[in-house]
């Protein structure tokens, strides 16, 4: 990875099992190996019924998001956050990529065409960690985490990429970055 590359770590929390139900998003922007910006927002999902399972995970309820902007409004208002970045990073990237794609589709917006780096795969490949849940990787690296708060999860993910690149600057090559 070129040291001057910029990326955004992203994390979603969802209201139910459907991928278009984002109710919170955290984004952490990194440029030249330093965190330069953070964004956290609550999002009003398309349905008011929250899965008890999801509420138990992240603690967000309809009453917390009923006055929040829907995804389309939030994403358009904050579109500039992704300007100049070369990739997105997420822990279990297939989940966050699918949430972003489903929310963009539902909102009639194009999904970003940036490659995703998965920090689960980084942790397995670089440090041979098992298990690779976010708290496990953070504990291994000595990182603070308020798990299932999208802002904290996104920052932890950004710091995992930073640690991986510091240890092996070529570790992102398998992701096409």
Can you annotate each of these PLM segments?
Residues 1, 158-177:
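Acidic two-metal-ion nuclease catalytic site recognized across multiple nuclease folds
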Residues 1-113, 128, 135-148:
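Conserved non-catalytic scaffold segment of RNase H-like nuclease domains
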Residues 100, 122, 157-161:
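Buried hydrophobic packing segments
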Residues 113-114, 170:
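P-loop/Walker A phosphate-binding loop and immediately adjacent motor/lid segment at beta-alpha junctions
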Residues 114-118, 175-177:
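Beta-strand segments within the central parallel beta-sheet cores of soluble alpha/beta enzyme folds
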Residues 116-133:
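Short alpha-helix plus adjacent loop in nuclease-associated cores
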Residues 153:
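Conserved catalytic/binding loops enriched for acidic/polar residues
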């Amino acid at each position: 990875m070129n040291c001057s590359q910029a990326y955004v770590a992203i994390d979603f929390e969802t209201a139910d099992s459907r991928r278009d139900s984002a109710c919170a998003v955290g984004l952490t922007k990194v440029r030249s190996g330093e965190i330069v910006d953070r964004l956290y927002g609550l999002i009003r999902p398309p349905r008011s019924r929250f899965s008890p399972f999801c509420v138990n995970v992240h603690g967000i309820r309809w009453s917390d998001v009923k006055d929040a902007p829907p995804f389309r409004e939030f994403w358009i208002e904050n579109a500039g956050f992704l300007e100049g970045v070369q990739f997105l990073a997420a822990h279990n990237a297939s989940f966050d990529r699918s949430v972003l794609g489903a929310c963009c589709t539902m909102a009639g917006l194009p999904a970003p065409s940036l490659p995703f780096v998965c920090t689960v795969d980084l942790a397995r490949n670089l440090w041979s960690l098992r298990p690779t849940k976010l708290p496990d990787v953070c504990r291994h690296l000595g990182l603070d985490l308020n798990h299932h708060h999208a802002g904290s999860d996104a920052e932890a993910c950004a710091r995992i990429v930073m640690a991986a690149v510091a240890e092996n600057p070529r570790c992102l090559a398998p992701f096409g970055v």
